[in-house]
A protein has these predicted regions:
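Iron-sulfur cluster-binding electron-transfer modules in prokaryotic oxidoreductases
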Residues: 28-334
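Cationic, low-complexity basic patches in intrinsically disordered or flexible, solvent-exposed regions
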Residues: 3, 26
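Residue-level detector of alpha-helical hydrophobic segments embedded in or interacting with membranes
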Residues: 1, 19-22, 40
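Intrinsic-disorder-associated, low-complexity terminal segments enriched in Asp/Asn/His/Tyr and depleted
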Residues: 7-10, 14-22, 29
Length: 334
C-alpha cells in the first residue's frame, strides 16, 4: 500500500506560528552503548521522517542508540520548508530556519539531521546568516527582531548543521563504526543515491566532494557491502517536480533506478527521505510510466548501517517500504 505524500502548509509568512518557544526538549534516546567517543547532538528529524517515512525516524533511533550517540530532539522545531518558503519570501525561509538553528544553539550542540533536504536548506541558511554577521548585519538584526517578537532566542551563528552521514564518517569515525559491526553485509551490492541537496545546496561542503563523493561508499565498505557506481547518483531524484511535472519526475526517477539496476545493484541507499519517496513510494507508478519492471529496494542510510550492527529488520521499519526489501534480507540470510 502506498504511503501518503507529505505536504506543506500555506507558506504565507503572516500565518507562520512561532509562538511555542517554551516547551522543553526531550532525549530521543540515551547512550546505552559505550564507544570510545561520546557524541551528543540537537536532533532535527524533519517532518517527512515523522510522517510518510516513519521508518527513517525509527531506524535513526535504533542506530544511534546502538552506537551510544545521544540525540536531544528539537520538539519545538519547524519544518525547514524544503526549499519552498523562499518562493514566497527569502526572509521567511531565513527566519524560520534561524529559529531552528537557535534551538540547537541554546543547547550548545551541533544540529543533526538525517534528511538531505533539511541539511541543504538549513545548512544554506546557516551559511548565509554567518556571512551576514559581517556583510549585512541589518538584515540579521531584522531576523532576530522577528524572533524576539515571538519570544524566541536570537540566531548567533555559534553551531553547525550536520547530516547523520557526516556525523558517522567524521565524528564517530569509520574505524569505530567497523568495531561495532556484528553482521557484515558481505555480497550485498549497494548503489548510493546522494541526490542534489546534500552535496550542492551549500557553497562549502568540508566532508566530501560535491561532484565525486565517496562518503556513502566508504560507509558501505565499512559494513562489508560492495559499492556500485552509476551515472545518476548525485543528480536530483525528481521529487521537486512531482507536484506539477509528474512525467518528468517519473522519468528522472526511472532513469536513476534503471542505471543502478544495470550496474548490478541489489538495492539503492539514500540519505534523503524525499528521494526515498520518489524512488520507493512512487516506484510502482514510475515503473508503469517507464513501461517495464523495476522492483529495486530503496533503503534509508541508517537502516543499512543498523542491519550491520545486528539490529532486527522489523525494528528498522523495513516492512514499511512500498518496494519489498525481502530480496535484500534474503541475500543477507535474514
Amino acid at each position: 500500500m502506498q504511503r501518503p505524500t507529505p505536504h506543506h502548509n500555506n507558506r504565507r509568512s503572516d500565518r507562520l506560528d512561532l509562538t511555542y518557544c517554551d516547551r522543553p526538549e526531550r532525549p530521543l534516546n540515551c547512550a546505552t552503548a559505550m564507544p570510545s567517543l561520546t557524541l551528543k547532538y540537537a536532533y532535527f528529524p524533519g517532518c517527512v521522517a515523522q510522517g510518510a517515512c516513519g521508518e527513517l525516524y525509527q531506524s535513526t533511533a535504533a542506530l544511534t542508540k546502538a552506537l551510544g550517540i545521544e540525540l536531544l530532539e528539537l520538539k519545538k522545531a519547524s519544518c525547514c520548508g524544503s526549499g519552498t518558503f523562499k518562493e514566497d519570501s527569502r526572509l521567511l525561509e531565513d527566519t524560520v530556519n534561524a529559529r531552528n538553528i537557535a534551538l540547537a544553539e541554546q543547547l550548545n550542540l551541533p544540529l543533526l539531521t538525517h534528511c538531505s533536504t533539511c541539511q541543504g536548506v538549513i545548512g544554506h541558511v546557516d551559511e548565509r546568516l554567518k556571512d551576514f554577521q559581517t556583510s549585512d548585519p541589518a538584515y540579521l538584526n531584522q531576523i532576530n527582531g522577528l524572533l524576539q517578537k515571538q519570544n524566541c532566542s536570537p540566531y548567533q551563528g555559534t553551531t553547525e548543521v550536520k547530516h547523520l552521514l557526516w556525523a558517522l564518517v567524521t565524528d564517530y569515525g569509520l574505524d569505530e563504526l567497523q568495531k561495532r559491526v556484528t553482521r557484515k553485509l558481505s555480497g550485498l551490492k549497494c548503489a548510493a543515491f546522494y541526490g542534489c541537496y546534500l552535496l550542492r545546496a551549500q557553497k562549502t561542503i568540508p566532508y566530501d566532494d560535491p561532484y565525486q563523493p565517496e562518503s556513502m561508499e566508504n560507509v558501505f565498505r565499512t559494513v562489508g557491502a560492495t559499492p556500485v557506481y552509476y551515472p545518476g547518483r548525485t543528480q536530483c531524484c525528481g521529487w521537486p517536480l512531482s507536484s506539477y511535472a509528474t512525467d518528468q519526475a517519473f522519468q528522472m526517477a526511472g532513469n536513476h533506478l534503471d542505471e543502478a539496476i544495470a550496474a548490478g545493484a541489489d538495492c539503492l541507499v539514500t540519505p534523503c527521505p524525499l528521494c526515498h519517496l520518489n524512488l520507493d513510494s512512487r516506484q510502482p507508478e514510475v515503473a508503469k510510466f517507464m513501461g517495464h519492471k523495476l522492483d529495486l529496494p530503496v533503503l534509508h542510510l541508517p537502516q543499512l548501517v543498523a542491519l550491520a550492527l545486528g539490529i532486527p529488520p522489523k525494528a528498522l521499519g523495513l516492512d514499511r517500504h512500498v518496494v519489498s526489501t525481502r530480496s535484500v534480507l534474503e541475500k543477507l540470510g535474514l
